[in-house]
A protein has these predicted regions:
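Ligand-binding clefts of soluble mixed alpha/beta catalytic domains
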Residues: 2-22, 35-314, 319-594
Length: 594
C-alpha cells in the first residue's frame, strides 16, 4: 500500500490562539513557533474566496435537490392523489419543528441503475421527536413503489445500527411493494440480505430494549410484513395501508379465493380480526400525530451526559455551549484550491469548536497530528486532527510532512485515545491523512509497532467515535483515523473529501513506474498506447476518490456542507451519548446476558 504522496509541497507554519484575548508576547507559544509565517494562512478580507470547495458544495446541493424529488414531480402528485404524503413530507411532519436533522445515505445508489434508484428508494434520517433523538426509516413509494434494491437493505441496516448502538427509538414509515424482483439476488440471500433487518428487529426487541414503532401507510407485503410485526407498536392507515404475506392476486393464484386487499389485510382487518395491529387512524397526519404521542410517552432513559459529579466511564461531560470562534463560511477560504496545498488546521477548528477553544495535548510533540480536548454545543470530546504542511524535526532530522503518520505521532495519538477512553470522552477524528511514512529511518524506528498500537487503541476504544473527512483519507492512515471498517458511530465528509488507497498519480507510478523508468533510461517517451492507459488510471482514480462516489456506496453516512458541520456533529454527539455503555461494533449485548 503506497503511503506518502510525493507531491506534498510548500511549508505551513501555525499558531495556537491563547485562551485569553491577550496579544502574544515573549515566552508565549506563538513566539516560540517559527515554522513559517501564518499570514498566508489566515483570512484576508480583501482576498477573493477560493472556489474549489464552493463549486463542489454547489454541485452537491444541486444533486441533493434532485434526489429529494424521489421518482419525480408526477409520481409525487400521484402519491398525493392517493391521499398519501411522500416519505419526506411524512418525516418533516414527524420531526420537531426548527430542529436539526441529518439524512443518512441520501447519495446511496445515485450513480447506479441508470439513475433510477434515487436514495435507493428509502429515506433514513436522524432527528428529534418530542425533544428526543430518534432514527426514522421511510420507504419512498415514488421510487419503484418503495421496493427494495440491495442498497435499500444496506441503508435500513445502517439506520438500525445507529439505533442499536445508541439505544434510541427507531420509527418505520412503511410504504413498500417489497423486493425489487429483478434484483432479488442482491436482496434476498446472504448474511447482510433482507433477513438481517429482521434479525436486528429481534435483537432490539428482546435484548437491547430499543423502542420500535411502525406506521403502515401503504403496502407492506410478503417478508417485509415481519418488520412492523417485530415492532413494539403498529399503526395502520385506513384505506391506504395493506399488510400481508401475500396480496390478493397471490391468494387467488395459490388458493383460488377471490378477495380484495383491504378485506384481506387492511387496517380494519388487522385491528379487528387478526389483532396484528394496535392502532387504526384515518390518514397519514393522524398516524404521525400518534407516533409523536407515543414517543413523548416513552420513559426517559439515563443520559450519557454528565455535569461533572458522576464518574461513569462512558459519560461525556457538558459545559455551557458557545458558538464557534469563526463563522463556518470562513472554511471556504481556509481550504485551498489544490488539495495538495497546506492550510492551517487550527484555523479550521476555530470554525467548528465552541469558541475555537482547543486544550491541546502534547502541543510541541509530533506536530503533524493535533490532539486535544474541546467541545461542540457544550459536549466535551477529544479531537484528533491531521495538520497539513511541513514541520521541523526538533532533533535536526528531515522536515516532516503534515498529513503523514510518523512513529512519534502514532504513539502520541494512541496514548491520547487511551486517556480519553479511560475518562469516557467521545472522540472526533478530523481526517486529512495521506498515509503512514515509509523509508529506512521510520522502519528502523518501529513504525509498524507504533502504527499497530495506534490502530489497536482506536479500534478497542469503547467511547463514541465520530469522523469528519475534510480532504484526504488515504492508505492505512485512513484506517488508523477511524475508517469505516472500524465502526465509528458516524462518518461524515465535506465535498472535498478524497477516499482511496492512494492518489491517481501515485497509482500511475505504482503500475507503470518500472516501464516509465526503462523508457527514460533509453531516452524514449511513453507510447500513445501507454499514455492512454495512464490517463485511464488517473481518470478512474479521480472519479473514485470523489466524496460523492464514496457516499453512493455507503462508505460515508453523508456528504455535508461546511455550514452544516456543527449541526451534524452536535446531533451525532447527542445521539451517541444516549447510551452510557460501551460503543463497540454494531451493538453490544448487555452484560447481564453474557
Amino acid at each position: 500500500m503506497a503511503e506518502r504522496e510525493s507531491e506534498v509541497v510548500s511549508t505551513s507554519g501555525f499558531k495556537v490562539r491563547p485562551l485569553s484575548k491577550r496579544e502574544p508576547g515573549a515566552g508565549s507559544r506563538e513566539s516560540e513557533i517559527s515554522e513559517g509565517s501564518t499570514a498566508s494562512l489566515t483570512t484576508n478580507p480583501d482576498k477573493p474566496k477560493q472556489s474549489r470547495l464552493h463549486e463542489l458544495t454547489n454541485e452537491l446541493r444541486e444533486l441533493e435537490a434532485k434526489l429529494r424529488l424521489g421518482g419525480g414531480i408526477e409520481r409525487i402528485e400521484k402519491q398525493h392523489k392517493q391521499g398519501k404524503l411522500t416519505a419526506r413530507e411524512r418525516i418533516d411532519l414527524l420531526l420537531d419543528k426548527d430542529s436539526f436533522s441529518q439524512e443518512i445515505g441520501l447519495l446511496v445508489a445515485y450513480d447506479q441503475y441508470d439513475g433510477g434508484a434515487p436514495a435507493a428508494g428509502v429515506v433514513t434520517t436522524v432527528g428529534r421527536v418530542s425533544g428526543r433523538e430518534v432514527v426514522v426509516v421511510a420507504n419512498d413509494a415514488t421510487v419503484k413503489a418503495g421496493s427494495w434494491w440491495p442498497e435499500t437493505i444496506k441503508k435500513i441496516l445502517r439506520a438500525q445500527e445507529i439505533a442499536m448502538r445508541s439505544r434510541i427509538p427507531i420509527i418505520y414509515l412503511v410504504d413498500s411493494a417489497g423486493v425489487n424482483l429483478p434484483y432479488q439476488g442482491g436482496v434476498f440471500p446472504g448474511q447482510y440480505g433482507a433477513a438481517r433487518i429482521f434479525y436486528y428487529n429481534s435483537i432490539m426487541r428482546r435484548y437491547l430494549k430499543v423502542p420500535q414503532i411502525s406506521a403502515v401507510m401503504g403496502p407492506c407485503i410478503a417478508g417485509g410484513a415481519y418488520l412492523p410485526a417485530l415492532s413494539d407498536v403498529i399503526i395502520m392507515v385506513e384505506g391506504t395501508s395493506f399488510m400481508g404475506l401475500g396480496g390478493a392476486n397471490l391468494v387467488k393464484g395459490a388458493t383460488g379465493q377471490t378477495i380484495d386487499n383491504e378485506t384481506l389485510g387492511g387496517a380494519r382487518a388487522h385491528n379487528e380480526l387478526s389483532g396484528v395491529a394496535h392502532y387504526r387512524v384515518k390518514n397519514d397526519e393522524e398516524a404521525i400525530a400518534k407516533i409523536r404521542e407515543f414517543v413523548a410517552e416513552l420513559p426517559r432513559k439515563y443520559s450519557g451526559l454528565r455535569t461533572g459529579d458522576s464518574d461513569s466511564f462512558s459519560q461525556s461531560s457538558v459545559r455551557s455551549p458557545q458558538s464557534s470562534k469563526r463563522p463556518p463560511e470562513d472554511i471556504y477560504e481556509i481550504i485551498p484550491e489544490n488539495h495538495r496545498q497546506p492550510y492551517d488546521m487550527r484555523a479550521l477548528l476555530d470554525c467548528i469548536l465552541d469558541d475555537g477553544h482547543l486544550d491541546e495535548f502534547q502541543a510541541y510533540y509530533a506536530k503533524e497530528i493535533v490532539t486535544g480536548h474541546a467541545s461542540i454545543a457544550g459536549i466535551q470530546m477529544g479531537v484528533i486532527a491531521n495538520a497539513r504542511g511541513m514541520f521541523r524535526d526538533p532533533s535536526g532530522g528531515a522536515p516532516r510532512f503534515g498529513g503523514i503518520v510518523y512513529t512519534e505521532s502514532a504513539e502520541k495519538v494512541a496514548y491520547f485515545i487511551d486517556t480519553c477512553n479511560r475518562h469516557g470522552t467521545p472522540l472526533l477524528f478530523v481526517q486529512d491523512v495521506s498515509g503512514f511514512m515509509v523509508g529506512p529511518e521510520v522502519e528502523h524506528s518501529g513504525i509498524i509497532r507504533a502504527g499497530a498500537r495506534f490502530v489497536e487503541a482506536m479500534a478497542t476504544a469503547i467511547v463514541p467515535k465520530i469522523v469528519l473527512t475534510v480532504n484526504h483519507a488515504s492508505g492505512a492512515g485512513y484506517y488508523a483515523m477511524a475508517g469505516q471498517g472500524f465502526d465509528p458511530n458516524f462518518i461524515f465528509s465535506w465535498p472535498t473529501g478524497r477516499m482511496g488507497v492512494m492518489e491517481g498519480e501515485s497509482a500511475v507510478q505504482a503500475v507503470f513506474g518500472s516501464e516509465l523508468d526503462r523508457l527514460k533510461k533509453n531516452g524514449q517517451d511513453p507510447t500513445p498506447e501507454l499514455e492512454i492507459e495512464m490517463r485511464s488510471v488517473r481518470e478512474t482514480y479521480e472519479r473514485e476518490l470523489d466524496a460523492k462516489y464514496a457516499a453512493a456506496r455507503g462508505f460515508v453516512d453523508a456528504v455535508i456542507a461546511p455550514e452544516e458541520t456543527r449541526g451534524a456533529l452536535e446531533l451525532a454527539l447527542r445521539v451517541s451519548v444516549n447510551y452510557s455503555g460501551p460503543h463497540l461494533g454494531q451493538f453490544v449485548v448487555p452484560a447481564s446476558l453474557t
